[in-house]
UniProtKB/Swiss-Prot annotation:
GO cellular component: chromosome; chromosome, telomeric region; condensed nuclear chromosome; lateral element; nucleoplasm; nucleus; site of double-strand break
Record-listed ATP binding positions: G126, E127, F128, R129, T130, G131, K132, T133
Localization (cell): Nucleus; Chromosome
Record's keyword annotation contains Electron transport: no
Pfam families, per database record: HHH_5, Rad51
Protein residues bound to ssDNA: R230, F233, R236, R242, R311
Protein name: Meiotic recombination protein DMC1/LIM15 homolog
Function of the molecule: Participates in meiotic recombination, specifically in homologous strand assimilation, which is required for the resolution of meiotic double-strand breaks.
Known partners and oligomeric status: Double stacked ring-shaped homooctamer. Interacts with BRCA2. Interacts with the MND1-PSMC3IP heterodimer. Interacts with RAD51AP1; the interaction is direct and stimulates DMC1-mediated homologous recombination.
Entry coiled-coil feature ranges: none
Main location: nucleus
Key words of the record: ATP-binding, Cell cycle, Chromosome, DNA-binding, Meiosis, Nucleotide-binding, Nucleus
UniProt-listed PANTHER family: MEIOTIC RECOMBINATION PROTEIN DMC1_LIM15 HOMOLOG (PTHR22942:SF30), RECA/RAD51/RADA DNA STRAND-PAIRING FAMILY MEMBER (PTHR22942)
Length: 340
C-alpha cells in the first residue's frame, strides 16, 4: 500500500514537472506557425506558462507579432494550460516541488526554513564585508550537492555586476565539501553585466538556457541587483524611470523562478537613511531599491558584522519564517557555522 502511495506521489511530481516545462513548440498543433514560435523564443519565452505570464501588450512588442497573431497565440496557450484556480490542497501538493539549497551553515539554514528556496526571490542586503558575495560563492558550490527532501543538485547561473566573482574562491569552497574543482567550475555559467539594459537582456538568455536544459539548472545568482541601476539612473529626476525598469526586471525574475522551478538569490547594497535620524536609530541605513524591490523579494535577509569573522543574519521579511537572527562565520571554505 505504501509503495503504491510513493509511486502515485512520484508520478504526481513528474506530472507537475511536465506541466512546468510544456514546450512552446506544442503551439504548432493549434495552428501557430514555427516562424512565430521562433520570434517568441528570441525574447526568452520558451514555455506555454511563459506565454500565460506575458501580457498581450508585451507580446505585441515582439517584432513581427500583430495583435491578431497575439490573440491567436493566447487562445492556443489557454487550450494547453489548466484553468487558473486550484484548491489549497492541490496547491500544497504542487508546493512539494519546492526545494531548498543549503547556505553552508546549519544555523543560517534553520533561520530560512531549510535554505534558499526555489520558486522565490531571496534577497540578502548589508554593508560591505557582511558576507553577501561570500554567500553567493558558497551557494555556487552547495547548489551542486545533493540535499534534503530528494534534492539532487544542479547547475548555476551567476550574473556579476560588480566584478566580484572569483573562480579560485569556488576551488577553496569545493575543497571543504570534497568536490572536484573542475566539475564545480564547469557547472557554473558566468556572465558579466555592464549596464542595467545588459542585465535585463541577459535574463532572456537565462530563460532560454533554463528551457534548453530543463530541470538541470537550480539557481540564479545576481550580485548585486541594484549596482548598475544606481550608475545608469542618477538623481531624483531619473528615479521614476529607474524604478519602472527595476520593476520590469524583478517581474521577469519572479516569472523565471516559477516557470522553471529555480531559486533566485540576489544581493543588495545599503544607503544612508536621513529620515531615520528622527527615530533615534544608532546607524540609520536602509537597502536600496525602495518599495518595488521590497515587495518583489519573497524573503529578505539583513546581514551585519559581528566579532571578527562572525556575521549576523536577520529575517527582515518572509511570508512564512518569523523575524529571527542567526550567527554564522566566513571561513576559508565559505559560509559555515560559528564556533562557540
Amino acid at each position: 500500500m505504501k509503495e503504491d502511495q510513493v509511486v502515485q506521489e512520484e508520478s504526481g511530481f513528474q506530472d507537475d514537472e511536465e506541466s512546468l516545462f510544456q514546450d512552446i513548440d506544442l503551439l504548432q498543433k493549434h495552428g501557430i506557425n514555427m516562424a512565430d514560435i521562433k520570434k517568441l523564443k528570441s525574447v526568452g519565452i520558451c514555455t506555454i506558462k511563459g506565454i500565460q505570464m506575458t501580457t498581450r501588450r508585451a507580446l505585441c512588442n515582439v517584432k513581427g507579432l500583430s495583435e491578431a497573431k497575439v490573440e491567436k497565440i493566447k487562445e492556443a496557450a489557454n487550450k494547453l494550460i489548466e484553468p487558473g484556480f486550484l484548491t489549497a490542497f492541490q496547491y500544497s501538493e504542487r508546493r512539494k516541488m519546492v526545494f531548498h539549497i543549503t547556505t553552508g551553515s546549519q544555523e543560517f539554514d534553520k533561520l530560512l526554513g531549510g535554505g534558499i528556496e526555489s520558486m522565490a526571490i531571496t534577497e540578502a542586503f548589508g554593508e560591505f564585508r557582511t558576507g553577501k558575495t561570500q554567500l553567493s560563492h558558497t551557494l555556487c558550490v552547495t547548489a551542486q550537492l545533493p540535499g534534503t527532501g530528494g534534492y539532487s543538485g544542479g547547475k548555476i547561473i551567476f550574473i556579476d555586476t560588480e566584478n566580484t566573482f572569483r573562480p579560485d574562491r569556488l576551488r577553496d569552497i569545493a575543497d571543504r565539501f570534497n568536490v572536484d574543482h573542475e566539475a564545480v567550475l564547469d557547472n557554473v555559467l558566468y556572465a558579466r553585466a555592464y549596464t542595467s539594459e545588459h542585465q535585463m537582456e541577459l535574463l532572456d538568455y537565462v530563460a532560454a538556457k533554463f528551457h534548453e536544459e530543463a530541470g538541470i539548472f537550480k539557481l540564479l545568482i545576481i550580485d548585486s541587483i541594484m549596482a548598475l541601476f544606481r550608475v545608469d539612473f542618477s538623481g531624483r529626476g531619473e528615479l521614476a524611470e529607474r524604478q519602472q525598469k527595476l520593476a520590469q526586471m524583478l517581474s521577469r525574475l519572479q516569472k523565471i523562478s516559477e516557470e522553471y522551478n529555480v531559486a533566485v538569490f540576489v544581493t543588495n547594497q545599503m544607503t544612508a537613511d536621513p529620515g531615520a535620524t528622527m527615530t533615534f536609530q544608532a546607524d540609520p541605513k536602509k537597502p536600496i531599491g525602495g518599495h518595488i524591490l521590497a515587495h518583489a523579494s519573497t524573503t529578505r535577509i539583513s546581514l551585519r558584522k559581528g566579532r571578527g569573522e562572525l556575521r549576523i543574519a536577520k529575517i527582515y521579511d518572509s511570508p512564512e519564517m518569523p523575524e529571527n537572527e542567526a550567527t554564522f562565520a566566513i571561513t576559508a571554505g565559505g559560509i559555515g557555522d560559528a564556533k562557540e
